[in-house]
Amino acid sequence: MKKIFFILGFLVLSISSIACPICGCGGGNLYFGLLPNFSSQFLGIRYHYAEYHTQLANDPTQFSTNHYNSVEVWTGFNISRRLKVFGFVPYYANKQVDDDGTSFKNGLGDITAMAQYQLLHTTKRTNSNKVLDQQVWFGGGFKLPTGGFNVNLKDTNTTIADINAQLGTGSLDFLLNGLYTISVGNFGVNASATYKINTTNHDQYRYGNKFSSTCIGYYKIAVKQHTISPNIGIGYESVSSNVLNGAKVQYTGSHVTTALAGVEFGFNKIGMGMNVQLPMQQNFAEGQTQLRLKAMAHLTFAL
């Protein structure tokens, strides 16, 4: 597929001429979703999968299917009743299949640390004697450039596909996050939003800022001393264009809306769950790239 891409070696003089249809999904991701129902700290492992397919509109024989796999260690601690901190350490094992063959890229991704402060927590009884609980959290954090950004922008064979395949952004990036939860008895809704602010790396390349949000409804079913919580929801993600030397990179930036369904299990000090996201509406590389599937599974332990 590389043979049809415009080279990046001339970007400094003519960045507007880039024509690369590979999806703008590089730069890493952070997903909160439904947090474990533990009263204290937790430690767990999560698996994330995403699949994208690209096919050139003017030459269908040129294609690429990208499989993004990551295994992530995540943890959370209660510093106080109102303050929580989180850590995320991802390892990526990515695979790309295209008309030129198959390639792999594995390694440590960018490590993220965040803190959340509870702005509001109210609890009261409804007329039907059910407990109505509401919480509002707000926080922020940073992402360290621990993942590799090993691409030579002066190499005439380098493409945007190579940039999106990098394990990290090569930059110190920042995040803002808000979370609202409301539950009445066994039914609840969790809404979260995260804005990721990317900075320019040492190669003068900056991935686009990313806004992501989810709204998930769940119902908690008690089975003896355990719980099962099926959930459904909707997700939205919008990414602005990448920038090189102060100019926007063509065919980067995207937005996608997904439908989500999953289930969470609680066994005393053990939590596990999974979900699947399917696209309802999307726009990557002017329609030449399509998200096919996202999925997540986790196993988490209370400490």
Predicted regions, residues:
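Surface-exposed strand-loop-strand hairpins of Gram-negative outer-membrane beta-barrel proteins
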Residues: H48-S70
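Outer membrane beta-barrel transmembrane domains
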Residues: T54, Q204-L303
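Residues that define the transmembrane beta-barrel architecture of outer-membrane proteins
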Residues: S39, H67-V71, K105-A113, Q134, ...
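Outer-membrane beta-barrel biogenesis signature
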Residues: S17-T54, T123-Q135
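Repeated loop/turn-to-beta-strand initiation elements of outer-membrane beta-barrel proteins
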Residues: Q41, R82-V85, T122-R125, N186-V189, ...
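Residue-level signature of outer-membrane beta-barrel architecture
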Residues: P36, Y47, F77, V89, ...
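Transmembrane beta-barrel strands of outer-membrane/channel proteins
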Residues: L43-E51, G87-Y91, F138-L144, A191-Y195, ...
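Outer-membrane pore/translocation modules
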Residues: D100-Y195, T199-R206
